[in-house]
């Protein structure tokens, strides 16, 4: 068995054993997971973890990476988010939390254009290099704090928050087009929900929460007040 065969077998196992069993069944999503090579976005020192059911640290030790939100999300979480918002070929997408660039690459394989924001300079460089090597040309990686989105480039058809938040800031919702979708992981450890918000009118939105998970925080998003008595 060649190294390439082993790699493809591991990818197959990830899709069949982790992702399909988590109700990710859209054939377009499953095809993207075959096409976009996850291992090309994983740090060299963690290549053995590319298809493992876990978060992968992008910088430093695992605990520190979790605290700073500098990770690749679990593969099944990435796939579920992608299925929830699946962009159309004419759509413009905003991602907050570029990380290694993998989610942006998945989104870009469907969308017309993706802008992804990353606050950590080292990860900005990593994402840009990974996307360039993968020949993904319709993604722009910007070094920026994404907690308030990117109103100057809006409105967007799709917004993806690649990490967890206590709540979705109104400023981000206002940057959705009518008919646009926002995906986020919302809540507090140990109870977080995969959340899909659709803008249905100028001031109306629908929210569905379809699945449970836990993910590291995105930096600088508001946290709920904690009163002590």
Task: List where the protein language model places each region.
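Conserved nucleotide-cofactor-binding alpha/beta core module
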Residues: 82-205
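Class I SAM-dependent transferase core
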Residues: 1-94, 110, 123-133, 201-218, ...
